[in-house]
Amino acid sequence: MKKETIKVGQVTVDFLLEAADTNGSIAMFEFTVPVGAKVPIPHYHEHFEETIYGLAGILTFNVNGKAIEIGPGETCFVPRGAVHGFDNFKQVDAKALSVITPALLGPIFFKEVAEILNAGGPPDVEKLGMVMTKYGLIPAMPKMKDA
């Protein structure tokens, strides 16, 4: 049962379980990524893992430089410290289930990010980075290759 729906820019997050529901063991949410949506910048988690299970469409995750396509019924595990991000490069909306262990990331993070992204105009990147860091998501700029 959906507890709460949060619109974060173009991505929709539907929370199913949060820390209070699971004695802190897991948080679980579905997220829907429209075709061509702007998605989170590459980042890593300091204190939790994330497991993604594909529900519809195909998302392309980049985990530590490796591209992994996640379709319905497929999974991707993102360990602590692994730099990752995702995109929807296909022609249909994509939906996946995310499980956070332990439950250190909840709806409040997405609400704070939504305030920044939904404010209109270009997002305040500095504020966004501060909110991410506050919740243990560390922005990671891609390494530039030497010319």
Feature map (PLM): residue ranges:
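Structural motif
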Residues: 12, 51, 58-60, 67, ...
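Short, charged/polar surface micro-motifs in flexible loops or helix N-caps
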Residues: 21-23, 34-38, 58-60, 83, ...
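Acidic/histidine-enriched, glycine/proline-rich intrinsically disordered or flexible terminal extensions
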Residues: 112-147
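A short glycine-rich, His/Asp/Glu-containing loop-to-beta-strand
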Residues: 6-42, 49
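Ligand-binding loop in jelly-roll beta-barrel domains
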Residues: 80-107
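Short acidic-glycine-tyrosine-enriched beta hairpin
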Residues: 65-83
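Short, conserved beta-strand element in jelly-roll/cupin
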Residues: 30-34, 44-62, 99-101
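Structural signal for conserved beta-strand scaffold positions within catalytic alpha/beta enzyme cores
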Residues: 7, 15, 98, 139-141
